[in-house]
A protein has these predicted regions:
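Conserved, well-structured core segments that form or line functional sites
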Residues: 141
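Short, thiol/selenol-centered motifs that function as redox-active sites or metal-ligating centers
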Residues: 144-148
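Extended, subdomain-level signal for the structured scaffold at the beginning of enzyme domains
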Residues: 1-137, 150-266
Length: 266
């Protein structure tokens, strides 16, 4: 018998804007998606995957290899097979359908990274409704790597906030960032220095804003690991955030521990 349901929110983005015009390839990271999802299932919970358009997330090719699984080819193949074949990953819902149903059936929400959320999830109105619901009820909200940027979907004008970040309009960013429900929360996110090798090796250009700046401007208290790409997870009230791809196992452990505490309390 399942101990509860966890909503996993994926991105449908495949391209991200780069400075000077044009776009670069992006998507969702395989390990960031499947490592926590598989761990949650192994711990006795169900997983439901939802995206803006109801289609399976596009896996960023930069993540689609064994290097993100400690060089373990068998672990990578298990992860790939799970994503490609398991009903929890292939029976994808739309975010709107999730909102239209009973949100109280979910014990937690989890948003993995890759740069995809920077394109669609951070300005998705339906995700904003979901995250506001979870925040108001102090329900577990976990986000990994670029995933924490999706919390900005809860702003009254999330699209305008993103546009102001791209335009570099600091005054507008400050104005539209007021009243964010996570202001004052301790959190982490993919760092500006960690972004550089991604920009150089895969995007061949710079994105318009950094993740720490975007969260910090709205009032997030952003911290980071002492060394780039070292695992780092921050937990503050209902919010659990992980800094980078290597934080996949640690955030899974924190998420499961929080779920188990909530199950006992219930």
């Amino acid at each position: 018998m399942s101990k509860g349901k966890v909503l996993v929110v994926g991105s449908n983005a495949t391209r991200i804007e780069i400075q000077g015009g044009g776009t670069g390839p992006t998507g969702q990271y395989l390990n960031e998606t499947v490592v926590p999802a598989m761990a949650v299932i192994d711990a006795g919970y169900e997983v439901v995957l939802a995206t803006p358009n109801g289609k399976q997330p596009y896996i960023d090719p930069a993540s689609d290899h064994a290097a993100h699984f400690g060089g373990d080819e068998k672990a990578y193949r298990r992860a790939r097979d799970y994503f490609d074949k398991d009903p929890s990953m292939t029976n994808v819902r739309t975010l709107r359908a999730i909102v239209d149903e009973a949100l109280d059936q979910y014990a937690a929400v989890f948003v993995p990274g890759g740069q995809g959320p920077v394109v669609d999830l951070m300005q998705d109105a339906e995700l904003g409704k979901i995250l506001r619901y979870f925040h108001e009820r102090k329900k577990i909200t976990a986000l990994l790597c670029h995933g924490p940027i999706a919390t900005l979907a809860t702003l009254p004008d999330a699209k305008g906030y993103r546009a102001a970040l791209i335009a570099g309009d600091k005054a507008k960013v400050a104005e539209l960032g007021k009243g964010w429900q996570y202001a004052g929360y301790k959190m982490t996110v993919f760092t500006a220095s960690e972004e550089i090798p991604i920009e150089e090796q895969f995007l061949h250009g710079k994105i318009y804003f950094t993740m720490p700046d975007a969260l910090g401007a709205a009032g997030g208290e952003v911290s980071r690991s002492a060394v780039d790409f070292e695992p780092y997870v921050v937990e503050d009230r209902e919010l659990i955030t992980g800094q980078n791809p290597r934080s996949d196992h640690p955030i899974a452990a924190k998420l499961i521990a929080a779920l188990d505490r909530a199950t006992v309390a219930a």
